Amino acid sequence: MSERVPSIRAEIVSVGDELLKGQRVNTNASFIARSLGSVGIPVVRVTACSDFESEMASVFREALGRADVVLVTGGLGPTRDDRTRKAAGELLGLGLRLDPDALREVERRVTAHGRTMSELMQGQAMVLDGSRAIPNTRGTAAGMIIPAGERFGGSHLVLMPGVPVEMEAMMELTVQPWLRGLSDTTIIHTPVKTTGIGESTLADMLPDIEDSLPEGTSLAYLPHGAGVDLMVSTIARDPLRAERDNAAVVEAIRERAAAFIFAVGTASLEETIIGMLASGGLTLSVAESCTGGLIASRLTDVPGSSVSLMQGFIVYSNSAKEELLGVSRGLIDTHGAVSEEVACAMALGCLRRSGTSIALATTGIAGPGGGSPEKPVGTLCLAIARQVPGSGPSVGVRTLHMHGDRLQNKHRFSEAALRDLWVALRGEQGG
């Protein structure tokens, strides 16, 4: 794969001791990187630094020497440890001025809360000489776009608050449109989402595709608990070429790994399942023991799920399995509550009592107790029953073994159940 150096390079600097101490997660950098990618500007480095002015100035100097645009978050607030303006001003030899539009916005917000304007609050409207103020529609501290001058080869320094909602509004309303005017490239990111396959196994399926990627196209593996997301990224000056090259790689991956791909795009597995149920005119019910309602919860997170998900049973105790689903006591005594026989009975009982097209049932041992040599912690019995026109219900079942603590096992159980449900729905639709 050959790579082309982009015309504009960006760096992100996140200011705050709380980041270095692990007291906050740096979600700002992720948001900014995605925003930059959408306008064809790649991020070449992300740095976190302390609130000390000397440290900030050093980081800003190095970043401006490497990148065309340096985006900084944090240190614009009214407290003593908010020193980003001063550090940037001293580095660039720029003084501060009061921006009248920013001041009016600060005054409006302060008086709206019944407070009196203070010198510290007025400082929120201070911007560096020669900069363009960035309005803060969600807070008080103004941001700024600062030309760094010939000393730094015409690079720009962009200062924004560290409060995520304030920074995000600035990026979307002001910074992103400004950046779009700087970039002469188009970048396309296409997620390809898989389930039921590990990273190394998937990579073994795609070596020739990776070896023949078009110029400017890259393939990233993003593993997670349920599978691996692939990100196909293409950057090119010609928008039509970017779309063509990206689509060709995505299609090649789809043909090679079709059995594991549930979505091309941003849809989650839950969204995909609800969409398949709705498009097929199918209804679903769930009977959960070890997952305790987690499967139903995940499915109902999807808007419009009420069209397809009809009913759920949380049958944690043996008596609940008997009373709500009609599982016989003899079956439980003979095989145990965690068994394929009981899972099948749960799924069939759920199907019968709900009247849905498909029923899903889980019974297992999440831990930390309850395991045995024959049925260790992490054992899951998973059954899916369905109505077969003209021949009555059918049921399929399998046993899986997970390794994790209680919460990890519950999540993995739900992932396995959703994955099997997706596979079953593909069979219903001839996929």
UniProtKB/Swiss-Prot annotation:
Cross-referenced SMART domains, in alphabetical order? Answer: MoCF_biosynth
Q: Disulfide connectivity?
A: none
Reading the lineage from the top rank, the first entry is: Bacteria
Query: Which InterPro entries does the entry mention?
Result: CinA (IPR050101), CinA-like_C (IPR036653), CinA_C (IPR008136), CinA_KH (IPR041424), Competence-induced_CinA (IPR008135), MoaB/Mog-like_dom_sf (IPR036425), MoaB/Mog_dom (IPR001453)
Q: Known PANTHER family for this protein?
A: NICOTINAMIDE-NUCLEOTIDE AMIDOHYDROLASE PNCC, NMN AMIDOHYDROLASE-LIKE PROTEIN YFAY
Q: What family, per the record?
A: Belongs to the CinA family.
**Name of the molecule in the record:** CinA-like protein
| Species of origin | Chlorobium luteolum (strain DSM 273 / BCRC 81028 / 2530) (Pelodictyon luteolum)
